[in-house]
Amino acid sequence: MTASVARFIESFIPENYNLFLDINRSEKTFTGNVAITGEALDNHISLHQKDLTISSVLLDNESLNFQMDDANEAFHIELPETGVLTLVIEFSGRITDNMTGIYPSYYTHNGEKKEIISTQFESHFAREAFPSVDEPEAKATFDFSLKFDAEEGDIALSNMPEINSHLREETGVWTFETTPRMSTYLLAFGFGALQGKTAKTQNGTEVGVFATVAQAENSVDFALDIAVRVIDFYEDYFQVKYPIPLSYHLALPDFSAGAMENWGLVTYREVYLLVDENSSAASRQQVALVVAHELAHQWFGNLVTMKWWDDLWLNESFANMMEYVSVDAIEPSWNIFEDFQTTGVPHALQRDATDGVQSVHMEVNHPDEINTLFDSAIVYAKGSRLMHMLRRWLGDEAFAKGLKAYFEKHQYNNTIGRDLWNALSDASGKDVSSFMDTWLEQPGYPVVSAEVVDDTLILSQKQFFIGEHEDKGRLWEIPLNTNWKGLPDTLSEERIEIPNYNQLVAENNGALRLNTANTAHYITDYQGQLLDQLLEEFANLDTVSKLQILQERRLLAESGRISYESLFALLDLVEKEESFLIAQAKSQILAGLKRFIDEDTEAEVHYKALVRRQFQNDFERLGFDAKDGESDEDEMVRQTALSYLIQADYQPAVLAAASVFQAHKENIESIPASVRGLVLINQMKQENSLTLVEDYVNAYVTTNDSNFRRQLTQAVSYLKNQEGLDYVLGQLKDKHVVKPQDLYLWYMNFLSKSFAQETFWNWAKDNWDWIKAALGGDMSFDSFVNIPAGIFKTQERLDQYIAFFEPQTSDKALERNILMGIKTIAARVDLIEKEKAEVESALKDY
């Protein structure tokens, strides 16, 4: 673990930054000055800076001595006095393409390459733009002004509204209102040839969505509508008004993360903000969720901020939960919680079952560790699920009441996790800390075994693992959330015995179910008659319960607690189901079964027959083309079904896709987005030519539609000729073709295809130093460790993975993922070796 970093706020407490930046876009340089008013507690203080040149430090117009400390991203100042004072600092720096600090985004408009300038200061990159106490606890107000080499039509945006626009016309300086007290990582700005639209919330907050001029004017409309309605919802739910005058949202062509919650100027990847009339239902829902997530942060993270990065998980877990709560409230017909059940839940359960996984709450000694510890499956998905679990345990009324008290007490200040637990405890009368500690401080989750022995119902808990592990006897405070009366509310000990099972049966209706609604973070292993009764009633269960059974039995099969072959009986039960939830659950089981299958074998023929049988009913019901007035759910079921049917060479789907391609071959971007990716994949599978590869790559370069680019990436990966692979490899290092932020998508798609796997695995190893240099500061860098761990399934690949990555475990940013990757592949290899023959035999007889 990295040594603890010094906290500069302990010697200097800033209150206000009066910051001016003069940016030379063409030269990629900037100069600036900042007057920092604050209280010095010592004669020797330190400020953060990274890659800045500090020209002077003045106090009352007198120069002060200072010492640069680049190794610690700091400089140290000698003061003649302590107390409240104002330091005036002159500095300069360079703009780089690292997507941190101040950086450019590149795009093409009318054939001309253009750029906009924007910022990314979370977690500790404000120091790349100006001297500061760059720590979340060091909240201050900001008076920000900006000058740049403007071109006609350029506009600038920041956290607050512009003031003195008449002076800008004379001086070229953009000046913005004073911000509220906030952390340095939330300051933001962007400028260039931008366009946008605005609207007002019920309480008068101005909401705006902006993008480059290369985007369609109406591409901002959907997000604007969502943002307005979500702010209205949050103000009502939290009973705390949105705290600042504006809420702007800016889509950036180059962006390391998915989005960033800068107060008043949220920044996004284009794919997570922009929607047009051809966008799919899934894309629209994803945009709505991301916008709602970032807006939740305006209260939880911005208005009230964690004291140190240890509690950053709470910001993200809370926002991840609230995105679903808010979107469900404004668009109930979407049934958006189903999206979480099919994405976040299985992601968390799979990752959290590997020995060595982190706990949700982790000590952070240095900001450099944040990306190391920021496992999205744990911090976002598991953390969100724990917040859903807590909300259900408390009840929504007490939960909302506690949040209101929390915001009112701590607004514009910093907190630790206990402060939220105290507010929720006061509102509910329950001991929240005691309930949550076992879930937050321990890695993993339990499996609850349920069985009947001699008229006694036995419930026991044990940590659930997939693969090699060390059992440390961990126990959890498990909310049973059962559909039966007469059972305890929680299971906190290792085992409980509940007598008179037959009497319980007589007093209750239906088979016993635990964790109803699937909100708590555990799975259940029903045994014997309990499983038999559950499966007998399967057809009458609600859709979430059906999904839950499929997910849990699949995980039990992954762990070896039950056979993979036993899952075929479950597929029989859901063959005719029509919901998106079940389509996704089926697809997860089918994806698991596919790992047992080698290409061009008899087993593959039988596997494809199984796939066709599972999804043929959906195709016959829905067809290939969208119907007027059909539901979003039907559209998404069609997408899932077609994706499997085309892989399984189902001829009606293959021929329909080919027909659509021919009708749009002069402009493939015009193919309806909901089936466009599948049409492109089908054409590559059928044609498999270098010419088509080149056409797809050319379309990738020229389009401004991020969703279309992702579809093209996936489609190109289905090529099966070495000439085409060599052509693609030649494009990967050209940032004008493949943006560094998207490189992992190309790698993932090609590595998952057997024909391309060897070529791309060797490419990654041979070019590792370049990948690290290009992406070392990017949040997608560890994907290059995790992606092969999620794909490889042979002993040969495991040996290669170990040989390449094990020597790199000295890199703390990679160590945990490497060690977990080894265990993940080893578990898969072991499972396939043990059950391959049984699965192939079952496929043959199916």
Give the positions of each predicted feature.
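Short helix/loop capping segments that flank catalytic or ligand/cofactor-binding pockets
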Residues: 99, 155-157, 184-186, 276, ...
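Short glycine/serine/proline-enriched coil/turn segments at secondary-structure junctions
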Residues: 26-28, 136, 257-259, 704-705
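Hydrophobic alpha-helical and helix-loop surface patches within well-folded domains
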Residues: 176, 209-470, 592, 599-621, ...
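Small/polar loops that bind or transfer phosphate-bearing groups
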Residues: 49, 291, 716
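Short, well-ordered loop/turn elements at secondary-structure boundaries
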Residues: 82, 139-140, 151, 170, ...
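Acidic/His-enriched low-complexity segments
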Residues: 1-245, 360, 366, 375-381, ...
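Non-catalytic accessory/interaction domains
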Residues: 147, 211, 296, 363-367, ...
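Short alpha-helical hairpin
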Residues: 112, 200-204, 266-267, 354-361, ...
